[in-house]
Every structure is written in structure tokens, then in C-alpha cells.
Amino acid sequence: MVNNHESTVATRMIIESIKKTGTKLEPIILPATTPQTIGEGIDQLNMNGVAWTYPLDEHQDGLDLKTGLRLTHYKTENHSNRVACMISHMRCWQKSIELNQTIVVLEHDALFTDTLCPEDLTSEWKGGIIGLNDPRGATRRSQEFHRKVSSYVGLQPVPSVDDWDVPQGLAGNSAYMISPKAAKKLLNKVKAIGMWPNDALMCKQLFPWLEVVYPYYTTIQKGLKSTTTQ
């Protein structure tokens, strides 16, 4: 997903890493949704009338009655950037449905470190979403996440690294495989509970079948600015 010059350069690095590792993917570059194109993205997804329901500041933090989860706002200078990021991911999910194919979603900061052959993973997976990314430096409590995941080789459930009512999912959402069936479940959940940051929505409490894999296939490129905290 690309939305500026820095993202374009980073995307070239992703493509180069795909070639270097011999990863079996055919890249499709999807222009990212921006604050200026949020309305267009919502129209494409038929999500008109679906509100953002995740806390925007500390005054809204607390228990979400629909899900029973304890939600904490993300520090974001421009909330529209966070919404745009979510819509970009939702458009990727819709693309999986339209193609009727399992796809790999890559944010602009992803980088392959090992050869990925998707069929090697999909023959064993249970649910339809697999996190591919090294958690270290990419998620909350990343060392604990890594310690638990690296103790077992292969596909495994998302580890618990926090209290049971705190959303816990993939190690950041910069790289994950998703099936059309899972994509439909995610979009249906958005319609049911409203829009959340994609990494909060994709949590083990709402989708117990989420999986991660070790050894990892991707890491994040260093030094890139976040498009969601600005």
C-alpha cells in the first residue's frame, strides 16, 4: 500500500526483497487511501453509515460493551490518517474476496527476510489469517511475543502477552496472509461493531483462529515514518 514518495521507495525495497528471497508472490501495488480519499474508499466498500467506534482520546478509553474488550486510544496527531490506514486494509480484504484468492497484505515498511511459498503454509492453517512479521520492535511487548512464538517452529495461535480483555493480535499488521473467507469475516465484523484500527480489530478475542508463524518471513524497514501517528 503506497501513498507518498517515501512509501514508493520503500515499496521498491519490498519488491527487491521478494526477488532476493525467491518468494513466490506476484506483487500488486495498491494506492493507499489518504485522508483526502476516505470517502471514496468507504463508497467502494459499501460502508456508508459505518462509524468509527474506537476511542479517540483518553476520555473515551474503557470497556467496549459490544465486545467486552478494554480499549485504549492510539496516540495520533491526525485521526484521519488512522482511518485511512484502516480503509486501506479493508480494501485489501475486499480485493481478496474479489479475486477469490488468498493474498499477502504488505504495508510499505515490510521487508522479506526468508523465502515464502504460500502453499507451504495454507496446507496447514486453520482459520485464514497468518502473521508473517518478526514482532521485535513492531508491536507491544514484542520481546515477550517473540519469546513465546520462537519456542515452537511452525504455525501457532497468537500468543497472549497482556490481560485477557486487551485486544491482542498479530505482530503489527505490516505483513499477513489472508483468505477470502477470513476477509469476509473481518468486513462483517466492521459492519457489526464499527471501524477500529486494523491491528485492534484483528485480535484473538474476536477471531480466535488467528495464527502466526515461526521462523518469521518478514521484518520492518528501519527509519520510515509512521503514516498513522502523524
What spans do the regions from the language model cover?
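An acidic/histidine-cluster motif and surrounding catalytic segment
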Residues: 1-106, 110-230
